[in-house]
């Protein structure tokens, strides 16, 4: 074994934090890199890293006139998405992982992965990345340190997190931090030629909730390697929230201002590729309304001193699905990307050094596709992978709300749950109360997408859009949501109202009934007017839906019949849904809160009464 003192840079740490120094030394001794570098987050470091990555063939520098200071990466074709089947929650007690997670005993997983890590950084540089999720000025800053052998990860973490020397300084000598260890698992023998996207066919993304550790091996893809994102901000943070009385959620946060100048904040949980980023950056189509962005993917929510639920976005960047993002669907995202300073992965490359993906208008006559092959409009395959990504600073978003920077967050007035369903689910439904809202979230369902590897188009339950991200037993997670509703000392008026939306309902011919995108502002308007007590709703067995004339559809190319079908609660479709929900709830055994069974029974009774 190589003694740690022989690793270049190991004794040049810019910190005296004893726990951090001991951990870095331990990992260097285990993984035997050629040298250790502490990431400082500087512009000079970004230039050096991106130059090295271009020279290695991992990145291609884009046309600076089109995308200044931006780069393009192609991954190995086997390393393109989160790998849920290789993602583990290694709680001490298997019951704490629950039926929705893969589990392995922590000691066994650490034995297995320690052997994988042994010598895995040979021939490479080990980078130490101090980072903070959320504002470092927060009352309780949420620090992490990622160790990685991937310079692509270092460059991406600079976009996605607050990181570097200023974070290390803020940590001082004794701050707690989440230990996040990552390796691509591709050691280099002396003289061995590297590949442009090194990775390993053996992959593990393991979380140790009790010790707040993340160990990732074998994948360079963002969701598996940018450990501040899903791994820390959702899986580990959800456990922290359970223990400390707050929520870590897969939610956008937006600020909406009415024509009268009244301000509201809405959080929204949607499974991947269901329009979350598009909604977060909405351009309202109705006069006088204004939307600003606070976050597009993750919300941490805590009660404030006034008893209301406040949300912060812990991220510093946007890691969005590229296909389907265009000037029609999300002009603000396109404006953000045009400002540069971004990394694009697995999209297509134009002949003039720009990027392209499906949805961006007429395809060029020639592209180089995400696999590096020539592509023309006659090609059989898509030019860009369905889960291709852009990674860009959120501070470049032209409609970023100033409140984004507030370490105390913003008070949430409404929570949306939404999935992709072609039938059954109306355009918008208001929950009767908090517990009913938890029921709606717990039974959220969507047709699967390409954001995770596996079958596409299958309806699966995705509770609170958190199925792949709950770091503990989902039954306990539902209970935690219910308990959070008691945090206002009995004053439920301080809790956010809960809504279930579905932009994707289709008519008998298979066409979308609702135009979506900017027109979704019309649904937000109805929600705001409900909060203000000004909009009418009709009580149905599943909750409150807009009255026929309550939704502002002026100027829309929709018939009254289209609107009726979009809002319809079909009793037979809902009765068909009941056994599916029953089967879902049974997965959780005695961990499922009894009040959710009671909600299901009450729904069944209301449907039966309606059918008579």
Swiss-Prot record:
<dbReference type="Pfam" id="PF17297">
    <property type="entry name" value="PEPCK_N"/>
</dbReference>
<feature type="binding site">
    <location>
        <position position="420"/>
    </location>
    <ligand>
        <name>GTP</name>
    </ligand>
</feature>
<dbReference type="GO" id="GO:0005829">
    <property type="term" value="C:cytosol"/>
</dbReference>
<keyword id="KW-0312">Gluconeogenesis</keyword>
<feature type="binding site">
    <location>
        <position position="389"/>
    </location>
    <ligand>
        <name>GTP</name>
    </ligand>
</feature>
<keyword id="KW-0963">Cytoplasm</keyword>
<dbReference type="InterPro" id="IPR035078">
    <property type="entry name" value="PEP_carboxykinase_GTP_N"/>
</dbReference>
<feature type="binding site">
    <location>
        <position position="230"/>
    </location>
    <ligand>
        <name>Mn(2+)</name>
    </ligand>
</feature>
<protein>
    <recommendedName>
        <fullName>Phosphoenolpyruvate carboxykinase [GTP]</fullName>
        <ecNumber>4.1.1.32</ecNumber>
    </recommendedName>
</protein>
<dbReference type="GO" id="GO:0004613">
    <property type="term" value="F:phosphoenolpyruvate carboxykinase (GTP) activity"/>
</dbReference>
<dbReference type="InterPro" id="IPR008209">
    <property type="entry name" value="PEP_carboxykinase_GTP"/>
</dbReference>
<dbReference type="GO" id="GO:0033993">
    <property type="term" value="P:response to lipid"/>
</dbReference>
<keyword id="KW-0210">Decarboxylase</keyword>
<comment type="subunit">
    <text>Monomer.</text>
</comment>
<dbReference type="InterPro" id="IPR008210">
    <property type="entry name" value="PEP_carboxykinase_N"/>
</dbReference>
<comment type="function">
    <text>Catalyzes the conversion of oxaloacetate (OAA) to phosphoenolpyruvate (PEP), the rate-limiting step in the metabolic pathway that produces glucose from lactate and other precursors derived from the citric acid cycle.</text>
</comment>
<keyword id="KW-0479">Metal-binding</keyword>
<dbReference type="GO" id="GO:0019543">
    <property type="term" value="P:propionate catabolic process"/>
</dbReference>
<keyword id="KW-0342">GTP-binding</keyword>
<feature type="binding site">
    <location>
        <position position="272"/>
    </location>
    <ligand>
        <name>substrate</name>
    </ligand>
</feature>
<dbReference type="GO" id="GO:0030145">
    <property type="term" value="F:manganese ion binding"/>
</dbReference>
<keyword id="KW-0547">Nucleotide-binding</keyword>
<dbReference type="GO" id="GO:0042594">
    <property type="term" value="P:response to starvation"/>
</dbReference>
<dbReference type="InterPro" id="IPR018091">
    <property type="entry name" value="PEP_carboxykin_GTP_CS"/>
</dbReference>
<dbReference type="GO" id="GO:0006107">
    <property type="term" value="P:oxaloacetate metabolic process"/>
</dbReference>
<dbReference type="InterPro" id="IPR013035">
    <property type="entry name" value="PEP_carboxykinase_C"/>
</dbReference>
<feature type="binding site">
    <location>
        <position position="82"/>
    </location>
    <ligand>
        <name>substrate</name>
    </ligand>
</feature>
<dbReference type="GO" id="GO:0071333">
    <property type="term" value="P:cellular response to glucose stimulus"/>
</dbReference>
<comment type="similarity">
    <text>Belongs to the phosphoenolpyruvate carboxykinase [GTP] family.</text>
</comment>
<dbReference type="GO" id="GO:0006094">
    <property type="term" value="P:gluconeogenesis"/>
</dbReference>
<feature type="binding site">
    <location>
        <begin position="517"/>
        <end position="520"/>
    </location>
    <ligand>
        <name>GTP</name>
    </ligand>
</feature>
<dbReference type="GO" id="GO:0005525">
    <property type="term" value="F:GTP binding"/>
</dbReference>
<feature type="binding site">
    <location>
        <begin position="221"/>
        <end position="223"/>
    </location>
    <ligand>
        <name>substrate</name>
    </ligand>
</feature>
<feature type="binding site">
    <location>
        <position position="250"/>
    </location>
    <ligand>
        <name>Mn(2+)</name>
    </ligand>
</feature>
<dbReference type="GO" id="GO:0046327">
    <property type="term" value="P:glycerol biosynthetic process from pyruvate"/>
</dbReference>
<dbReference type="InterPro" id="IPR035077">
    <property type="entry name" value="PEP_carboxykinase_GTP_C"/>
</dbReference>
<keyword id="KW-0456">Lyase</keyword>
<feature type="binding site">
    <location>
        <position position="297"/>
    </location>
    <ligand>
        <name>Mn(2+)</name>
    </ligand>
</feature>
<comment type="pathway">
    <text>Carbohydrate biosynthesis; gluconeogenesis.</text>
</comment>
<feature type="active site">
    <location>
        <position position="274"/>
    </location>
</feature>
<feature type="binding site">
    <location>
        <begin position="273"/>
        <end position="278"/>
    </location>
    <ligand>
        <name>GTP</name>
    </ligand>
</feature>
<feature type="binding site">
    <location>
        <begin position="387"/>
        <end position="389"/>
    </location>
    <ligand>
        <name>substrate</name>
    </ligand>
</feature>
């Amino acid at each position: 074994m190589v003694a740690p003192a022989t690793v270049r840079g190991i004794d040049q740490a810019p910190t005296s934090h004893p726990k951090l120094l001991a951990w870095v030394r331990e990992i260097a001794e285990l993984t035997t890199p050629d040298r250790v570098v502490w990431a400082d987050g500087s512009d000079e470091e970004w230039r050096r890293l991106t130059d090295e990555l271009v020279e290695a063939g991992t990145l291609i520098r884009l046309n600076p006139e089109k995308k200044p200071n931006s780069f393009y990466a192609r991954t190995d074709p086997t390393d393109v998405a989160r790998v849920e089947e290789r993602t583990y929650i290694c709680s001490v007690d298997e019951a704490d992982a629950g039926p929705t997670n893969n589990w392995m005993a922590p000691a066994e997983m650490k034995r297995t992965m320690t052997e994988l890590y042994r010598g895995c950084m040979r021939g490479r540089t080990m980078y130490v990345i101090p980072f903070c999720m959320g504002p470092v000025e927060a009352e309780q800053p949420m620090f992490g340190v990622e160790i990685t052998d991937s310079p692509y990860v270092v460059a991406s973490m600079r976009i996605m997190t607050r990181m570097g020397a200023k974070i290390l300084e803020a940590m001082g000598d004794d701050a707690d931090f989440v230990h996040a260890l990552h390796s691509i698992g591709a050691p280099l023998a002396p003289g061995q030629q590297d590949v442009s996207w090194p990775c390993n066919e053996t992959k593990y993304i393991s979380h140790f909730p009790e010790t707040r550790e993340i160990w990732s091996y074998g994948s360079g893809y963002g969701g598996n390697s940018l450990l501040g994102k899903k791994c820390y901000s959702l899986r580990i943070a959800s456990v922290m929230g359970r223990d400390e009385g707050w929520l870590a959620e897969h939610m956008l946060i937006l600020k909406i201002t009415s024509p009268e100048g009244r301000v509201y904040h809405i959080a929204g949980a949607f499974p991947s590729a269901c329009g979350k980023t598009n909604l977060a950056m909405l351009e309202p189509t109705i006069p006088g309304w204004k939307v600003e962005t606070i976050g597009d993917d993750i919300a941490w929510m805590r009660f404030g001193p006034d008893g209301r639920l406040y949300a912060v976005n812990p991220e510093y960047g946007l890691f969005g699905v590229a296909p389907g993002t265009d000037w029609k669907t999300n002009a603000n995202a396109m404006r953000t990307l045009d400002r540069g300073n971004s990394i694009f992965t697995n999209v297509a490359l134009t002949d003039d050094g720009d990027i392209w993906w499906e949805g961006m208008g007429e395809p060029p006559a020639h592209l180089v596709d995400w696999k590096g092959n020539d592509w023309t409009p006659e090609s059989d395959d898509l030019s860009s992978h369905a889960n291709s990504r852009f990674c860009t600073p959120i501070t470049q978003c032209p409609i970023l709300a100033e409140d984004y920077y507030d370490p105390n967050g913003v008070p949430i007035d409404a929570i949306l749950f939404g999935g992709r369903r072609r039938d059954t689910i109306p355009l918008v439904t208001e929950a009767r109360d908090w517990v009913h809202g938890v029921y709606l979230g717990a039974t959220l369902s969507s047709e699967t997408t390409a954001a995770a590897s596996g079958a596409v188009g299958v309806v699966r339950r995705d509770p609170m859009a958190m199925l792949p991200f709950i770091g503990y037993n989902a039954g306990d997670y539902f209970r935690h949501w219910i308990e959070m509703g008691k945090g206002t000392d009995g004053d439920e008026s301080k809790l956010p109202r809960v809504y279930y939306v579905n932009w994707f309902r289709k008519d008998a011919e298979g066409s979308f009934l609702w135009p979506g995108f900017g027109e979704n502002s019309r649904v937000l308007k109805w929600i705001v007017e409900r909060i203000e007590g000004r909009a009418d709703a009709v009580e149905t067995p599943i909750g409150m839906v807009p009255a026929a004339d309550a939704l502002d559809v002026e100027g829309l190319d929709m018939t009254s019949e289209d609107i009726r079908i979009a809002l319809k609660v079909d009793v037979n479709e809902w009765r068909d849904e009941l056994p599916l929900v029953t089967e879902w709830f049974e997965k959780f055994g005695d961990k499922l809160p009894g009040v959710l069974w009671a909600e299901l029974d009450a729904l069944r009774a209301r449907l039966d009464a309606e059918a008579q």
